[in-house]
């Protein structure tokens, strides 16, 4: 199953990293630096310092790409 997690903060990043253990997971974040760090370093130091993310987790700043990718969307954004 292809999963997209919408949100690049604490909740979105934690859920995305956990889901990536079993599914093709793409995380959407607004901040291009957060996206770069997730993709290149497997970290999100702005929200989860000291925590290594799953190596298969990918991120994008392109909202449409995240939605097109998904069989399942998970919202991890503040309400």
Q: Where are these predicted regions, by residue range?
A:
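NAD(P)+-binding Rossmann beta1-loop-alpha1 motif at the extreme N-terminus of oxidoreductases
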Residues: 1-49, 58-61
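Rossmann-like NAD(P)-binding element
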Residues: 51-79
